[in-house]
């Protein structure tokens, strides 16, 4: 499976197309599931798509790899997609522009209420895992330097090269705030890289610190070490489905489907799903189907 487009032109063209007025006939009999442009979001989108396809008579269209957070938000507001997976901390800071909170329940409640009020969007129950940003270094470096936290890493950062995804460099809860909180200064300006390339670039010594995610399946596989966010900079990033209120009104049965997915995926299970696709290069559709069957959610 192609994990993500290799050229920036593809997501840009998709993004433009997503925001154009629709010329298609009414899609009352179908649901459009979207995702962001990284493996975990794709997998969550595929999980919802397979569940809806298995439990309803609706046709399910997949519009995956829609660049980042802002494009997905615009797409769902424009009615070009009906549902996609989001993260509560991202919604709170990047979309709602609100200050972060360390309490998972508080973040969920604030996002749920504001999304309903401002956008007519409904948050379903959380999938069960929290995928926060992970500042990763090589395991060998963590052991050699005896460092476990971001605060400890600041002493070594001036000799390191860092790499981050584009969105992390631009977001209010991203690099600038992290650097200010910890006083981070690197050997050179951080490199902006595709999320799927960061872990291997770190392992191959092309960078020395990577901004990844805690459920990245390559962390244990490549012997990477996640530095503890000891100053609690990052808010909770609980994975949740976001769906249009109008879609739920037209297809109320989807609410039960999303409820059945609530709490079904642990941090470890999500990491294993990611690794099956990114590390073992397995077909994502098959990986998702096997997982749903193991949970008794589909036949």
Please identify what each model-predicted range represents.
Residues 169, 173-184, 252-299:
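An extracytoplasmic/periplasmic, membrane-proximal ligand-sensing/linker region
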Residues 59-74, 188-200:
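Short helix-initiation/N-cap motifs at beta->coil->alpha
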Residues 20-22:
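C-terminal motif of bacterial Sec signal peptides marking the signal peptidase cleavage site
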Residues 77-86, 158-160, 177, 202-212:
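Alpha-to-beta junction loops
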Residues 48-56, 150-188, 290-297:
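Ligand-binding cleft/hinge of the Venus flytrap
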Residues 28-40, 58-64, 158-163:
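Short, well-ordered beta-strand elements
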């Amino acid at each position: 499976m192609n994990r993500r487009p290799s050229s920036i032109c593809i997501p840009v063209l998709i993004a433009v197309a997503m925001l154009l007025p629709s010329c298609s006939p009414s899609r009352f009999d179908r649901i459009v599931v979207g995702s962001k442009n990284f493996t975990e979001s794709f997998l969550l989108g595929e999980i919802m798509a397979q569940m809806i396809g298995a439990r309803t008579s609706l046709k399910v269209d997949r519009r995956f790899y829609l660049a980042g957070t802002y494009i997905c938000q615009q797409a769902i507001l424009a009615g070009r997609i009906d549902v996609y997976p989001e993260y509560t901390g991202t919604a709170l800071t990047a979309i709602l522009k609100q200050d972060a909170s360390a309490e998972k329940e508080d973040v969920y409640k604030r996002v749920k209420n504001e999304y309903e009020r401002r956008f007519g969007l409904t948050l379903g129950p959380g999938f069960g895992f929290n995928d926060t940003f992970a500042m990763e270094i090589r395991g060998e470096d963590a052991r050699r330097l005896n460092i476990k936290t971001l605060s400890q890493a600041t002493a070594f950062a001036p000799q390191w090269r860092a790499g981050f995804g584009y969105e992390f460099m631009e977001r209010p809860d991203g690099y600038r705030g992290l650097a200010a909180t910890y006083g981070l200064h690197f050997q050179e300006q951080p490199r902006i890289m595709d999320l799927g390339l960061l872990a291997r670039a770190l392992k191959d010594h092309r960078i020395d610190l990577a901004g990844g995610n805690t459920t990245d399946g390559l962390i244990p596989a490549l012997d990477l070490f996640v530095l503890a966010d000891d100053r609690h900079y990052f808010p909770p990033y609980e994975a949740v489905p976001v769906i249009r209120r109008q879609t739920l009104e037209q297809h109320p049965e989807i609410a039960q489907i999303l409820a059945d997915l609530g709490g079904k995926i642990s941090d470890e299970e999500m990491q294993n799903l990611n690794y099956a696709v990114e590390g073992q290069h397995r077909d994502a559709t098959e990986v998702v189907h096997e997982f749903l069957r193991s949970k008794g959610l589909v036949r």
